């Protein structure tokens, strides 16, 4: 209980705000691909491209967002991005042309990429090392509490048939921003680490680029993200278009809710076990589980199989995302945590390529041929395993060398 009492009030604001923010987002964004294909008449590949626009912009924006938060402080970056988010969701509600959805979702990715590195770095700044794993996982749990209710609300309000439900996230992010601004005013002593203030963006980029272990792991994490992206892009299109699946849109909404429930049920037991090992071990196992979940789709699409797919995928998701922030926090150079949390945003390349490749597979093979669609997607995801294994091996060797130097007699 003492660890819980050590959590800063602003950290609690971010955690609680995340619940409502993700609830609002998950009642709208996951249904966007279905809305674009069913109502707007877009092809599956174009719908995938619109979904990918968010992550595409985020690849570079997250690094700059993290760097700026290191240089000028977390507060301004978080407030600008969260009120920008409010306007973005209002834009979704007003959109009627396909190109507008592309632009607005790109801006959605920009706001997310600026807010998240700054908020994660702020959580790290305000938390003692012994409590950081708890704080990062409370934030992750908050995401999934929101996702338990969001898809159900999305089905109720008809998010796959109208853009009006996007007004709900607009209101919620506006309120979240106001509460956050009041908390910053109440606790005005927050500032950026001093070391990064005199470092140019090019110098900050070179620091992360020359970090060999970080770069190798980043490639593996990107391929994990490729697999993870299929759940919110290819899965809903496949479920809605497969002629053998009745009421696929409703079933997909229930899959999202089951996903969030399984996360909440398994997250802390898995983390309690996984914290005994390197975060890279969790990332490797998570990669394998996500790949297996897609492989199951190649042989069956019945309700029991779908439940098994969601459970397997979700365990992989927990292993990936419960330890990823801790890995970045551990490997980040002093004074550059925002930059490192931003640099991990380059892994969003997987979220750009994933929906696009998934959409192409559906267009190419047809939703009635899951064996081809998900064999390709599962195989690409599994390519991340060798990179993570290599990074783990190198990290283990460096740790051994460091211990040997410390134990060497003078």
Curated annotation (Swiss-Prot):
PROSITE patterns given in the database record: MFS (PS50850)
GO molecular function: transmembrane transporter activity
Domain of life per record: Bacteria
UniProt KW keywords: Cell membrane, Membrane, Transmembrane, Transmembrane helix, Transport
Membrane topology listed for this record: Multi-pass membrane protein
Location relative to the cell: Cell membrane
GO cellular component, as recorded: plasma membrane
UniProt keyword annotation of Amino-acid biosynthesis present: no
Principal location class: membrane
Ranges that cross the membrane: 14-34, 48-68, 82-102, 140-160, 164-184, 212-232, 251-271, 279-299, 303-323, 342-362, 371-391
Keyword Nucleotide-binding: no
SUPFAM superfamilies: MFS general substrate transporter
UniProt similarity note: Belongs to the major facilitator superfamily. TCR/Tet family.
Name this protein carries in UniProt: Uncharacterized MFS-type transporter YqjV
Organism: Bacillus subtilis (strain 168)
Lineage: Bacteria, Bacillati, Bacillota, Bacilli, Bacillales
Gene: yqjV
